[in-house]
């Protein structure tokens, strides 16, 4: 009997969907190795492998059969995706073009040899970033440079602006996936894209105000207010937008700073200067990476750099990786909570994830624990451990959807934190 590798869904799925992986037609108790490989848009290969043993019927199902070792061990149905590692050091898996899928190749090899035995079965699966019917609409309105993703069914939908970090450009993959959940999501560029400024010396809130007004006035966006979703620098900018601008009902901040970092934030006649960088506090890890977690002065000392969150009437959710080494995300979330409550504002929800690092992405993206930081100009450690980080991403994705459905007025069941 020939071995078969069975996937469900079989040929394609959305990136954030679970994938069922099973093998049939093996010998009873046969030892095998499963391998996965994905090539990104720049040609880098990401790989994972795990050793398994078939049951007495010659079958194994990753949802019921524990891995015996390899890139991960134990019962990990999606480990062949989240445990992938790049063949290039310090390389982060990023989807640049959401109109094409990532192609994942899976294979079953005989035995547990490190280099792999005879190939017994093989399958190819497409992981898509646009759910069927999701509409992708490039936006060039006034100064706004963005891409709007709309669900397939008729609107209006709850609206969300999505912001990434200091890498600049326009990343669409989180917005495109979220649009498949019933939201109108606009991925917003703010520098180093098209005709936008090439650097971040000053972040003018008027640009972001234009983006907010555009999305709020869109005929397929439900009012009166919209949501913000930001990670890292995008979280910092989301806090500034919620503090200075009108029409923002809800904001999710993923590992964001409460201080202006590396640039000035300005709105009308107000300016927030960047927090002081403490270069003597940059440490080196045993792997030769820079650790910058202590390299920013506390905004409790540099008080002028503290974003005035007390002005905001936005409802906040903070998602925090407790092993974030980019900066002190948990400290920032706690200080924001104290400041809001001291001014009679609603206490924000803070969900902390132990051993999760800086880049909390949609589910199944591999952990990027180290890489180039543009403001530092060197490879730094971002923190995190693969399994707890993967579990954090899974939970955070559900939490932010539940939060936005509740705050922006659409129905969704509550999701309890898993960690």
Curated annotation (Swiss-Prot):
Superkingdom of origin organism: Eukaryota
Active site: 232, 324, 358
Induction: In the liver, by peroxisome proliferator (Clofibrate) treatment, via the peroxisome proliferator-activated receptors (PPARs) or fasting for 24 hours.
SUPFAM superfamilies linked to this entry: alpha/beta-Hydrolases (SSF53474)
Disulfide cross-links: none
EC number of the protein: 3.1.2.-, 3.1.2.2
Pathway: Lipid metabolism; fatty acid metabolism
A GO molecular-function descriptor: carboxylic ester hydrolase activity
Single GO BP term: acyl-CoA metabolic process
Cellular localization per UniProt: Cytoplasm, Cytosol
Phosphoserine PTM positions: 416
Protein name per its UniProtKB record: Acyl-coenzyme A thioesterase 1
Native species: Mus musculus
Classification lineage: Eukaryota, Metazoa, Chordata, Craniata, Vertebrata
């Amino acid at each position: 009997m020939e071995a078969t590798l069975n996937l469900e869904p079989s040929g394609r799925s959305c990136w954030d969907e679970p994938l069922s992986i099973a093998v049939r037609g093996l010998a009873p108790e046969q030892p095998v190795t499963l391998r996965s490989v994905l090539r990104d848009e720049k040609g880098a290969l990401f790989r994972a492998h795990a050793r398994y043993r078939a049951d007495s019927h010659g079958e194994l199902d990753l949802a019921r059969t524990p891995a015996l070792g390899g890139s991960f061990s134990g019962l990990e149905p999606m480990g062949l995706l989240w445990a992938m590692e790049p063949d290039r050091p310090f390389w982060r898996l990023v989807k640049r073009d959401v109109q094409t899928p990532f192609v994942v190749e899976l294979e079953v090899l005989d035995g547990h040899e490190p280099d792999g035995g005879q190939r017994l079965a093989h399958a190819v699966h497409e992981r898509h970033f646009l759910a069927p019917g999701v509409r992708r609409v490039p936006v060039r309105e006034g100064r706004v440079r963005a891409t709007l993703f709309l669900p397939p069914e008729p609107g209006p939908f709850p609206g969300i602006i999505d912001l990434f970090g200091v890498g600049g450009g326009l990343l669409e993959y989180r917005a495109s996936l979220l649009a498949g959940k019933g939201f109108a999501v606009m991925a917003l560029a703010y520098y180093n894209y098209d005709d936008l400024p090439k650097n971040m010396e000053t972040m003018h809130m008027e640009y972001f105000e234009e983006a907010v007004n555009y999305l709020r006035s869109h005929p397929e966006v439900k009012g009166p207010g919209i949501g913000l979703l930001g990670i890292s620098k995008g979280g910092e900018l989301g806090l500034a937008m919620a503090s200075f601008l009108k029409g923002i009902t809800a904001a999710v901040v993923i590992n964001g700073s409460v201080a202006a970092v590396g640039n000035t934030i300005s709105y009308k006649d107000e300016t927030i200067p960047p927090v002081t960088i403490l270069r003597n506090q940059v440490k080196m890890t045993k792997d030769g990476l820079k650790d910058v977690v202590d390299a920013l002065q506390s905004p409790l000392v540099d008080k002028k750099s503290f974003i005035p969150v007390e002005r905001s009437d936005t409802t906040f959710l903070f998602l925090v990786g407790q092993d974030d080494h980019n900066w002190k995300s948990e400290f920032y979330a706690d200080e924001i909570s104290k400041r809001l409550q001291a001014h009679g504002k609603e206490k924000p929800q803070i969900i902390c994830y132990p051993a999760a690092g800086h880049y909390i992405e949609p589910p199944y993206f591999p952990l990027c624990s180290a890489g180039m930081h543009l403001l530092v100009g060197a490879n730094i450690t971002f923190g995190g451990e693969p399994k707890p980080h993967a579990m954090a991403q899974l939970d955070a994705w559900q939490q932010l959807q539940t939060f936005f459905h509740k705050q922006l007025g659409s129905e969704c069941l509550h999701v309890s934190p898993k960690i």
